[in-house]
Amino acid sequence: MSIPAVAPAPSLPRRLLRGLRLFAATALLALGGTAAAENLSTVASGSLAPLPAGADQPQLLVVDGRDVVLSAGKAWALASDGKAWQPLTLAPAGATADVRMAVNAGGQTWLLRGTADGSDRLQGVRLQGDSLALGRTLALPVALGQAQVAALGDVLYVAGTGADGSMRLYRHALAAEAGGWQAQPAWPAPGPLVALQGQKNGLYAVIGDATGDALWRWTVDQGWRQAPEPEGHILPGSLRALGQAHLLMLVRDAGATRLRTFHTITSAWATLDAPATAAAPAPLAIVARGTGLAWAGADGGVHYAEVQGGKHLLGWLDWSVIVIYLVGMIGIGVYFYLKDQTASESEFFVGGRSIPFWAAGISLYATNTSSISFIAIPAKAFETNWQYLTNNLVAVLGLMFVAVWIVPLLRRLDLMSVFSYLETRFHPAIRMLASALAIAMQVGSRLSVILFLPALAIATITGIDVVWSILIMGVFTIIYTVMGGMRAVVWTDFVQVFVKMGGAIFAIGFIVWTLGADFDGIREAAMAEHKTKLLDFSFDLTKATVWGFIFLVVFDVVLTFPKDQVLMQRTLATKSDKEAGRSIWIFAAIMIPGGFIFYSIGTALWMYYKHNPGRLDPLLPIDATFPLFIAAELPPGVTGLIIAGIFAAAMSTLSSIINSVATLLSVDFYDKLAKNPTERGSVRFAEIMTVVVGLAGMGLALVLSRYDIHSLFDVSIELAGLLGGGFAGAYTLGMFTRRANSPGVAIGIAGSIALTLLAWSFDLVHPYFYLGISILLCIVIGYLASLCFPAPARSLKGLTIYRQDAT
């Protein structure tokens, strides 16, 4: 009798994946089309003190943070209580009678002044007590009629009509010591100039027309291009920049006046609720004030409207999901603490060299995809395109070389600190110098940024102050890292990869479902705006090009992969050199699909906010776009799940950095400098340093929270290049040459750091090049300097990639 075949029971991973698919499909079916259409931002309006007597033709401006009225050669400043205008003394008297408008640039206010022939100069002005003092004058090349002035960073732009009636545009860089005014191409459209404004690396000009104004945008890459029309007439003087990517203005059509925003990334318009005072006859004067506008009415009143963002508090279900995740991470730390209470150095630093290669590979990816991947990369793709993804594609090719040649070589040496190699190959001083620079780079350029980004997300979503968010994140990470050592770090990484990738995939699916389109529709719309542009083969060194990424990967991955203790420590924790190489293959296999997921989030967000511009908060930084979407658009429970993903993205890298830096401090410094170091003392010192390093990262993150930084992704790249490239070239000199020696390497490290700082101070190239340049300089200078000293006398067996030195 034959026995019918019975299908084997699905494996646990398959059951989990099947459950996740069922959950996602059910959630999307239940939640599709639930996104609200109303604006997230509100408008607060009110009135200031009425215009002072005698201010019949007023000019409103803000000087050094105070509201000022100019009229007929007189000036007044608003009192601190906002109830009256106080007269100001002019120096010289009556000097402001010919002011046409004002703009703030370079840390001060500039007045556009002129005569009956037109505007002919800009002049700085400051408040000094109760006096309004005039300063530096910038004479225009020619007098301009209908002139408008704008600022883009510390660059002034002035536009208007020349004597022949043609439109003129001039720029002046305030920071430049020479150069003066430079003529620029004006927009190719007829009509009077209504307004001029700078925002997000672009200049915007409003051109008047009887049927409705036109908006033109200028950027370095594309020149002048017409943007979508505002559907009405923009009131002169009302155009202003708001936040990092919005324009705010008063638009009038069919007798109604609306407060409107234009998002410079999606080129989409949104309408806010304008106060009734804005619907009165045309204001006498308008000025950018706070987060909105202020205007003087014909009735003598001074009114204002300010844009306000909101906080999106988490519900009990969201907090429950987050708490379960955090408790789970602490639980893993407690488990390994109880299991290995008498941990040796090998157990605490490299997990007893018993970590499976597949777990090490997943941990490598988790560590490499921090909160920068989860928050800043979607923001970068949302703002620009996919060009930075080229780095992932090229890096995979570099990792193939690393898996075959570099990692097995170092794993055979049974290191705990990868900088021990530099001592064996060169000198103990080289090891300690390189280790110190690596510690500074990890704490300064990575730990602080990676901790700050999720804190920003939490603050955006919950309303909890960024300071408290940083403290909570840092403390939880420190606890499970100090308790469980390397084993806890690797296995929490393993869990965190699935948490954050699941949240990322769900977010993309939710956006596609909500828009009522499939991935092909989103891809086609995004490609029409070049949002998925991936490859740039130009030779412009100020841009992120293919050649730049190849240059970076050759020096950052192929030649100097061992410089990163955080990544190398996982390969050193595997059972053998073969398993160490396999962990790199796993890492490379995950990197490309993972990169596409995070860049797809940015493109999906662009499509969502292109169709729903009112759901953006103009006051939030671009880096907060994905956290805002999570908070405002996703339903309870799912929001908590993806917030847990943000936590996972940050904590996996934070714990890895903290553990690795503590390892370096213990192995490279404590064991070398202590009088009678013991194995138990080394582990105890590492535990203490885990806490100290975590607290230091928290402190630097608190400092970052006090600054308005446009893109933390770029900041992280820049700092890593300045701090991390100098010592990295030492590995290239050690593994790929047999002639390099310790004096030459020391000179190479010092010279590369000095020259890279020089390139940074003059802003010569794109920040992505700093790391590669620093490494290249270290290699070239170090090798040439080595030729001036005797060749190494010690054996190089097992220390280079060459066959004659193989073990």
Model-derived regions, located:
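Loop-to-helix junctions at membrane interfaces in multi-pass transport proteins
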Residues: 352-355, 376-390, 423, 498-639, ...
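Repeated scaffold domains used in trafficking and secretory/extracellular systems
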Residues: 54-60, 95-103, 142-150, 190-198, ...
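Helix-loop-helix module between adjacent transmembrane segments
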Residues: 390-481, 552-560, 648-656
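Membrane-interface "cap" regions at the ends of multi-pass membrane proteins
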Residues: 311-374, 481-484, 503-510, 516
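Transmembrane helix-loop boundary segments of multi-pass membrane transporters
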Residues: 309-318, 379-392, 451-468, 488-496, ...
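Blade-level signature of beta-propeller repeat domains, shared across WD40, Kelch, NHL, RCC1
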Residues: 274, 279-312
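Loop-to-transmembrane helix boundary motifs in multi-pass membrane proteins
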Residues: 428-432, 443-444, 666-707
